[in-house]
Regions:
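C-terminal catalytic histidine-bearing segment of alpha/beta-hydrolase fold enzymes
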Residues: 269, 276-321
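Sec-dependent signal peptide recognition
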Residues: 2-10
């Protein structure tokens, strides 16, 4: 089957899905259409090397007083040449945000990172945690910045381990950049029993420091954590990874960039100071004026590849793919 013909079949399947979604979901929006189209690209680009699937799982209720578990979405990538008769490590890859989703393109370069991880022998799952775009306005509005989204990433780990017996629960890492790095930090600090190690790249780490340099932060907090959180310093602390630095028990690697204009390096520096003050063993590197700013080690430069090589070496030390 030619590549063009395969693409045509996948696009026709996507159109059928769009028609069904449009009839089933009154909240269909352009982000949702873009998401379905991107799902086709994941399968087209990776179908030759991996079993690519989307799955639904459940998480904490959407509201504080609710009892019904919220339905969540995620991707799984399993290398096609994987020996399913032996145990393998798992990477939980948390995308950035605040509002975004797991997609093939853009500066986050997720497709390249997933491909590299698959080639190294990892199984990968990528949760589109509550607040992600592409699943309708209600799902996007359900964001809980620094809160339940962390549990959503943990839930994707649990679902994969329950579903696939060839995954080793002792060899699971969480990896993320930017807002995904924040989720990685919160998980390794608050749920050390679940993870062998974590990598956080240019992570949102200190929301009070962020509020000091980002005028829009109170608005972001109001929209993504509730009106009462907008100027509540205690809420900023409660939702900040730096607050929990003393709880670190597992290996952690952190990267920052002095020229990052999205997550200022002061956040990473504050995190490093908090970890050092608590006497924690961890690894970190703050690059000086690395070209590419916030995305410097996710692009396709020699420096980016070298930096990702350091990340993969760190992961391999603890996951042994």
């Amino acid at each position: 089957m030619t590549l063009l013909f395969r693409l045509l079949l996948l696009l026709l399947a996507a159109l059928a899905c769009l028609a069904q979604e449009a009839s089933d979901n009154s909240e269909s929006d352009p982000d949702h259409i873009a998401k379905l189209t991107d799902d086709v690209l994941w399968r087209l680009d990776f179908g030759g090397i991996a079993d690519v699937r989307t799955f639904r799982y459940t998480g904490l209720p959407q509201t504080r007083t609710g009892t019904a578990p919220m339905i969540l979405y995620a991707y799984s990538f399993i290398p096609k040449n994987l020996d399913r008769n032996t145990k393998h490590p798992l990477i939980v890859l948390a995308h950035g945000g605040v509002h975004s989703n797991f997609m093939t393109g853009g500066p986050a370069n997720a497709a390249t990172i997933v491909r590299e991880l698959l080639e190294l022998g990892y199984v990968v799952t990528a949760p589109d945690y509550r607040g992600s775009t592409g699943y309708g306005p209600a799902y996007q509005r359900a964001i809980d910045y620094g809160g339940k989204e962390n549990d959503d990433a943990l839930g994707a780990r649990s679902w994969m381990l329950e579903r696939y017996s060839f995954l080793d629960p002792q060899r699971v890492a969480i990896v993320g950049w930017s807002h995904g790095g924040m989720i990685a930090l919160m998980n390794i600090f608050q749920h050390p029993e679940a993870w062998a190690c974590a990598f956080a790249g240019e992570p949102v780490s200190d929301l009070l420091a962020r509020k000091a340099y980002l005028k829009s932060m109170p608005k972001t907090m109001a929209e993504s954590a509730g009106e009462e959180a907008a100027n509540n310093e205690e809420e900023y602390r409660r939702r900040s990874p730096v607050t929990y630095a003393a709880q670190l028990q597992k290996p952690l690697l952190v990267h920052g960039n002095s020229s990052d204009e999205t997550v200022h390096v002061v956040e990473v520096e504050n995190l490093v100071k908090a970890l050092q003050a608590a006497g924690k063993k961890f690894e970190y590197k703050i690059y000086q004026n690395a070209p590419g700013g916030h995305h410097f080690n996710r692009i396709d430069t020699a420096l980016a590849r070298q930096s990702r090589g350091e990340i993969y070496a760190f992961l391999a030390k603890y996951l042994q793919p």
